[in-house]
């Protein structure tokens, strides 16, 4: 019934017909933002979904910029508004980390520096602890006689905590010399002969009182960091909801219209479709005339033979085109009362075959 809306959409497809290529790839990179918007409203968004939102906003920004330049559709916001949203996400979270986790599975810090002072303090403490392990690594490297930090690794396992590791061959080369060595960390003397050395098939693990103490403190801080990360993530998503919820809802409608228009254009080009003509009828009249009607999905899946299109004429038959006035369906549908010349339905036998 809403002919104006249909005509508007058809006109938009005609306008974009030769210009949709630049935004087609961007549309393919946009996630289901309607679903993401619902999850933001419920504050049930996961960190990895935040990455989906971020990537989607980058592509949406390109679509909005395109529309700002060429005026096909008026976007609900400016590219500057989207830049603000994008920067809000980028400055708050480390997206290289958040993209790996559901909220319950977060195991490292993903909050950017300057967002939460408690997290920053705990991260600073852990950086100091880790630097002590690097002193130990540098001590071993001095005997390996190499500046390549990859020769000696610093690893951590849940059960064993922190330990240093190097190949069995390298350790055997320095074993005699390094076992008589020592180092001082925070005014405390550590004798290498007191270290625990675990020799494995191809590598050696090195533990000591220093690595044990650091492991305990580091893990204790990390647990606090993870819990604070979950709280801050929830708080920030709630802030985004208050600030950008309306914008997201408007973008959902905007992208849906652009996506539908591009889909119409691609289908029309592929199957050589043409626009329908809307016939003006009275309030109590309905009419539809479909000649050589084709179904894009069925036609695309046709594997054998030739797709057979259909002709359908329904409603007020007096409105039928002149060339179809002699159509057998129209002739046989005429009732005794010529004032009520309507076709209310078609009974189809069989299926579309070739």
Describe these PLM feature segments:
Residues 1-353:
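Alpha-helical coupling/stalk and coiled-coil linker elements that connect catalytic or binding modules
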